[in-house]
Amino acid sequence: MSDSILFAFSLTLLAGLATGIGSIIGFLSKDVNPKMLTVSLGFSAGVMLYVSMIEIFVKAKDALSVELGDKAGYIWTVIAFFVGIFVIALIDKLVPAYENPHEMNTEKIIEESSAKDKAKLLRMGLFSALAIGIHNFPEGLATFMSGLSNPTLGISIAVAIAIHNIPEGLAVSAPIYFATKSRKKAFVLSFLSGLAEPIGAIAGFFLLRTLFTELTFGLVFASVAGIMVYISLDELLPTAEEYGEHHLAIGGLVGGMLVMAVSLLLFL
């Protein structure tokens, strides 16, 4: 296995394991700093939006233009971009809102857990773990492909997705812990949901390695850009605003874009 593949896989694994951090927060503390969470999620959205539109979309277009010509290359980049959005939106739609970790208020779970039926809480946590696993699969592919293309790009996306995964880990562990009072169960299930990211990377690698051409790279990368834009707009920003002030979320967003822009400029 080449160093670049090992590096990209390691990034994906670390990003996925960030759900474990969220799970620890879920059963060790009832006090999640909402302002810090708002800024962090906004920052993550900024990184992902900037890199999707400025770097990944452009790389996809360049790769497809080499194979298909400028006009056809651009058309197929746009098509693949919206296919990526459609796929992740469909996954999101197929997960019922109550069990979807992106539709849940984890603060409310913590505050009202004593009044809830424990079996219902446990079911919520288990379905949240399943939902997060489904969502993390394409995110793992996005991180892996980015790491293969450009180490700096891969690190930035891995950090953004890791930040995104922390509240997801909390969404799994909080209901399971308050239902079972078992830290071990809460941590293990949250941890396993995060492993869907490296599994997505492995699956993507084995499926695409025999077909890996400029055309394949361009189509997959454009789809990855669409997936990341959807995650940012549908999950990260709404969740950031739910936990804190609108302007804090936007400040984090701009900060993430700025940091990403500077980091890309430094490695030109």
Swiss-Prot record:
A Pfam family matched in the record: Zip
Keyword RNA-binding in record: no
Topological type in the membrane: Multi-pass membrane protein
Keyword tags: Cell inner membrane, Cell membrane, Ion transport, Iron, Membrane, Metal-binding, Transmembrane, Transmembrane helix, Transport, Zinc, Zinc transport
Subcellular location: Cell inner membrane
Residue numbers binding Fe(2+): 136, 139, 165, 168, 197
Keyword Transport among record annotations: yes
Record-linked InterPro entries: ZIP (IPR003689), Zn_transptr_ZupT (IPR023498)
Source species, domain of life: Bacteria
Molecular function GO labels: metal ion binding; zinc ion transmembrane transporter activity
NCBIfam families tied to this protein: PRK04201.1
Stated family: Belongs to the ZIP transporter (TC 2.A.5) family. ZupT subfamily.
Biological function: Mediates zinc uptake. May also transport other divalent cations.
Name of the protein in question: Zinc transporter ZupT
